């Protein structure tokens, strides 16, 4: 498995911060995964709910009884490092950190982002983010839409990577 396959071609994924609360990123990501027809297993992670959008939820990735290829992290930035530690202990090699609150608000956030980068490198993980739009794979074999752009992308065989959320969202919309 290549380093990009960990992110773009997962057979299972956890949404850390999955939610039943409407109009939250954790809720929107869950809905998009289902609506776009993700072909793998989805494990909602939320310590307060036993079920998210009709799926069994787990308090932590460590409680999931199956292997997980990738984690989409949509929790408060101050909890992200702990979530990354748990992902490492679970053997998850690909993470997408949608959470904001890293270097964009200032020095404290920049330090938090530096710690995240160090952990990702130490653990040998592939990471997209933090503070990103998410990831999409339009290949019908995977049908992965773990982002919060306005519209669902057309299925097909074109790849696209964008550092800019505005540009990426514009292309997807």
Regions found by a protein language model. Give the residues of each.
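Catalytic-core regions of core metabolic enzymes
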Residues: 1-173
């Amino acid at each position: 498995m290549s380093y990009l396959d960990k992110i773009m071609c997962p057979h299972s994924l956890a949404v850390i911060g999955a939610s039943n609360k409407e109009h939250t990123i954790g809720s929107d990501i869950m809905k998009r995964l289902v609506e776009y027809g993700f072909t793998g297993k989805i494990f909602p992670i939320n310590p307060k709910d036993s079920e998210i959008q009709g799926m069994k939820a787990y308090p932590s990735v460590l409680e999931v009884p199956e292997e997980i290829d990738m984690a989409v992290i949509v929790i408060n930035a101050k909890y992200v490092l702990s979530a990354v530690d748990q992902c490492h202990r679970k053997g998850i090699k690909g993470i997408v950190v949608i959470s904001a609150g890293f270097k964009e608000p200032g020095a404290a956030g920049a330090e938090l982002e530096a710690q995240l980068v160090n952990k990702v490198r130490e653990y040998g993980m592939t990471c997209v983010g933090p503070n990103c739009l998410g990831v999409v794979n339009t290949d019908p074999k995977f049908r992965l839409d773990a982002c919060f752009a306005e519209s669902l992308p057309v299925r097909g065989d074109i790849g696209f990577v964008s550092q800019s959320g505005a540009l990426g969202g514009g292309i997807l919309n």
